[in-house]
Amino acid sequence: MIMRPSKRAANELRPLSFTTQFTRYAEGSVLVTLGNTKVICNASIVEGVPRFLKNSEQGWLTAEYGMLPRSTHSRMDREASRGKQGGRTVEIQRLIGRSLRAALDLKLLGPYTITIDCDVIQADGGTRTAAINGSCIAMIEALRHLQRKGILQTDPLKHKVAAVSVGIYKGVPVLDLDYAEDSNAHTDMNVVMTDNDAFIEIQGTAEGDAFHAKELDALINLARHGIKQIIEKQQEALS
């Protein structure tokens, strides 16, 4: 038994909420709040696909991710002012895009592109997992918009998708790390799954001591436990 900084149990998520229709203009818009982490996720739809998909008879989904300058303890420069995106930003937006494309039948989407914009307004660990969880809802809202307009006859959604962080903190596997835990964890892992208990992505790194197979199993089971709860929350938000 350990005392986590947030006083949560090892297998306990931070408080999680989704506010839908958060902004006015996007086809899908969600504010996701995960403890003290807050991310706005917007889904926009345009007709047409990237050049590499021309004549492919399928749609596309892409994602962008960014953090407001004062989303963290001290102000950071906007990446636009530096003239390029950082490696972390590129990695995260690719992860979001891969995760959500796994939820779709892109051929059923047709000649449309969904762009997901994730803007972190307050960061306390887990921004990429929160972004995936909120973006899944925003994407589904955007698909419903196309269905209401009669553009989509068949729903291209195959699965809901959710993500959570797990890690080894003070020698104990824990679920949903906040910043205080993440910055001191011996192992940090992000897990993305579908609502039928299948894995999309597992990213794990040992920061200090290497971890063993039994610890990996414990982390994966913690992630499955957390993702099941997150998907239930997503369903409530979409009902």
UniProtKB/Swiss-Prot annotation:
Name of encoding gene: rph
Name the UniProt record assigns to this protein: Ribonuclease PH
Binding of phosphate, residues: R88, G126, T127, R128
Keywords associated with the record: Nucleotidyltransferase, RNA-binding, rRNA processing, Transferase, tRNA processing, tRNA-binding
Biological source species: Coxiella burnetii (strain RSA 493 / Nine Mile phase I)
GO BP of this protein: rRNA catabolic process; rRNA processing; tRNA processing
CDD domains on file: RNase_PH_bact
Family: Belongs to the RNase PH family.
EC number: 2.7.7.56
